[in-house]
């Protein structure tokens, strides 16, 4: 009975108590099935993605466990880190198993190096930062018929506020922008960004067709059952996460966010692959809208789960952080919810609120493989 009566919701202060390293939120394990048996493009992409995670502002350091003979060579990773951050100075320990005298010794060394890294990481103390340092990922998954008229436009309004205040936002999932390309092209401030976006969309669409599919197959059975019967309908709602701001940059997968304002990032429509890509490009917070319910998170960027309707907020209250269903019932407007969401995002970024995905340790990490296994 005592266990059942204990509080299930932990606050940021609860989580921080009794830690050996109070300034370190935790150690996250990123495992993957890449690195070998793939084309060189995918192994290079994996190194760029890992470099993005290592240089992410939320990450204090890393211990890399390498086999030693794989396509994703350590030197490629090191070059990717140096390219992203020429002044990189975080603790970084790289161990190769094929150079170790035994697996036990290999693991022992990894633990020792990680502990030394934790000592250094704990010296970093949270300090106030301007909103211009915020990079917010804009994500959706398990969308329903309400997503495009509640959660997504509310997030879009918050995105516009962040842009106006000097921050950056990142809209991903290119297959779910099919049908609204022209609107986004018209919003590209630079002609080269408009052409890059159109070029990536054409190439992505052609590749989907070449394997016997196409963007029209993006809607899931759940999407269709709830009214999103075509990709264009789904895209019309998904694009609203980007608000009305002008597009400042267009990025291919793993490219780093370098410009404040609205960015477009090429990722697949798969929730976890896309969220993985957002953090790899530099997002330090991710807002994730859902109408049907999607229990996913990220190892390094807190994911704020937003419900599009009241029923979902009640049914899956263990994973939902922010409800926009009150827009549907007329209790709130897109503007009021967007402003409330901005305050919530700032509290999460400040460490004052711990989203459900963090509390539940939903540390999902799936790199996108564009090529084939060899």
Question: Residues of each region from the PLM?
Answer:
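Metallocofactor- and cofactor-centric catalytic cores in central/energy metabolism, strongly enriched
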Residues: 1-285, 292-374
């Amino acid at each position: 009975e005592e266990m059942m009566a204990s509080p299930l919701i932990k606050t940021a202060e609860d989580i921080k108590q009794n830690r050996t390293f109070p300034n370190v939120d935790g150690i996250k394990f990123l495992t993957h099935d890449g690195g070998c048996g793939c084309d060189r493009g995918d192994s290079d992409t994996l190194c760029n993605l890992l470099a993005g995670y290592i240089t992410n502002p939320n990450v204090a350091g890393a211990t890399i466990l390498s086999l030693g003979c794989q396509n994703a060579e350590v030197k490629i990773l090191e070059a990717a880190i140096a390219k992203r951050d020429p002044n990189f100075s975080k603790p970084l320990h790289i161990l190769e198993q094929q150079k170790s005298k035994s697996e036990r010794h290999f693991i022992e060394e990894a633990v020792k190096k990680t502990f030394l890294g934790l000592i250094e990481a704990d010296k970093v103390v949270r300090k106030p930062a301007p909103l211009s340092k915020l990079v917010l990922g804009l994500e959706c998954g398990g969308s329903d018929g309400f997503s495009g008229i509640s959660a997504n436009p509310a997030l879009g309004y918050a995105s516009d506020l962040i842009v106006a205040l000097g921050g950056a936002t990142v809209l991903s999932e290119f297959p779910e922008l099919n049908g609204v390309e022209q609107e986004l092209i018209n919003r590209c401030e630079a002609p080269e960004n408009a052409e890059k976006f159109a070029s990536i969309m054409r190439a992505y669409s052609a590749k989907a067709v070449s394997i016997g599919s196409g963007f029209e197959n993006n809607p899931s059975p759940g999407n269709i059952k709830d009214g999103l019967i075509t990709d264009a309908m789904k895209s019309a709602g998904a694009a609203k996460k980007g608000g009305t701001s002008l597009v400042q940059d267009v990025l291919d997968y793993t490219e780093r966010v370098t410009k404040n304002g609205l960015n477009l990032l090429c990722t697949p429509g798969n929730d976890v692959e896309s969220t993985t890509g957002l953090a790899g490009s530099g997002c330090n917070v991710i807002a994730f809208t859902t109408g049907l319910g999607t229990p996913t998170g990220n190892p390094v960027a807190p994911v704020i789960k937003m419900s599009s309707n009241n029923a979902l907020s009640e049914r899956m209250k263990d994973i939902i952080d922010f409800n926009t269903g009150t827009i549907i019932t007329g209790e709130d407007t897109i503007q009021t919810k967007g402003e409330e969401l901005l305050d919530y995002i700032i509290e999460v970024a400040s460490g004052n609120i711990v989203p459900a995905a963090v509390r539940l340790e939903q540390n999902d990490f799936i790199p996108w493989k564009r090529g084939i296994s060899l």
